[in-house]
From Swiss-Prot:
Protein name as annotated: Small ribosomal subunit protein bS16
Pfam families to which the protein is assigned, alphabetical: Ribosomal_S16 (PF00886)
Keywords, ordered alphabetically: Ribonucleoprotein, Ribosomal protein
Family: Belongs to the bacterial ribosomal protein bS16 family.
A biological process term (GO) from this entry: translation
GO cellular component: cytoplasm; small ribosomal subunit
ATP-binding keyword on record: no
HAMAP family recorded: Ribosomal_bS16 (MF_00385)
Gene coding for it: rpsP
Superkingdom in the source lineage: Bacteria
GO molecular function, one term: structural constituent of ribosome
Length: 86
């Protein structure tokens, strides 16, 4: 079982927001998450992102793989995903 840190789509039609979650890689996009690590609101005037960095570091140390989109969001917001990867 491979575990990934990725986005889970929420919200209404044309007004999405995303939760940053830990999921089994075989789970569907909107499936059951193991743990929620934060959120990302792309539609707001000021795009909001909040992440529990300590929990993310813990999951990465356990072998969780970041999705490409989550890596991009972390790099854009200076949260240094690369320095957290094992």
């Amino acid at each position: 079982m491979s575990v990934r840190i990725r986005l889970k789509r929420m919200g209404a039609k044309k007004r999405p927001y995303y939760r940053i979650v830990v999921m089994n890689s075989a789970s569907p996009r909107d499936g059951r998450a193991i743990e929620e690590l934060g959120y990302y609101h792309p539609v707001e005037k000021q795009k909001q992102i909040k992440i529990k960095e300590d929990r993310m570091k813990d999951w990465i140390s356990k072998g969780a793989i970041l999705s490409d989109t989550v890596k991009m969001l972390l790099n854009k917001n200076n949260l240094n995903a690369k320095s957290q990867e094992v």
